[in-house]
Amino acid sequence: VHTAQVHMGNTVAVWGVGGVGAHLVQLSKLAGAVPVIAVDLNDAVLERAKRLGADYAFRSDDPDLMKKIEDITDGRMVGIAFDAVGIQPTLRACVESLDINGKAVSIGLSPQNIDAGTFLEFNLKKKQLLGHLGYKRQDIARLADMLSYGRLDLTESISKIIPLTDIKQGIDDLENHRGNPIRI
């Protein structure tokens, strides 16, 4: 949210609303973004995103997704789109959803090459593509303050608490998406 400079009145869309994406929904809302749009393939994840503050939740495989975004933004599309997945189709969709001068922020990590659309589309609409990795110490301190004041809710991002003796099982559950975990 800091990298994209989300502020009051921005329209924000988040692709991939698992752990990081769910927090992006909350932080964008706290920064004053309106509307905040969650996009994912999993209906349960989309429901959680709505509980966490997303104004709209759409499936990424919906063939009418861009039309729906266009309709709710009165044709403007989004000012900021976050890719919390890190694969080519997701980044392309983020870029496609951008308004003139819009920013796409890539957060998800994968070994795939970046493919974000045509130069024509980027240049005519003055779109921006930003990368992001990690946080600074002061960002962590701000998040801790937000937690202590009750502004940020991380309870839905903790799927299960396990003893250290079960760590192998916890990692296996995460890797195999058993129970749709976010954090164990």
Segments from the language model and where they lie:
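Mid-domain Rossmann-like dinucleotide-binding core that forms the NAD(H)/NADP(H) cofactor-binding site
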Residues: 1-63, 67
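A generic alpha-to-beta junction signature in SAM-dependent methyltransferases
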Residues: 4-6, 73, 85, 98-99
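C-terminal hydrophobic helical "lid"/dimerization subdomain
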Residues: 92-96, 137-184
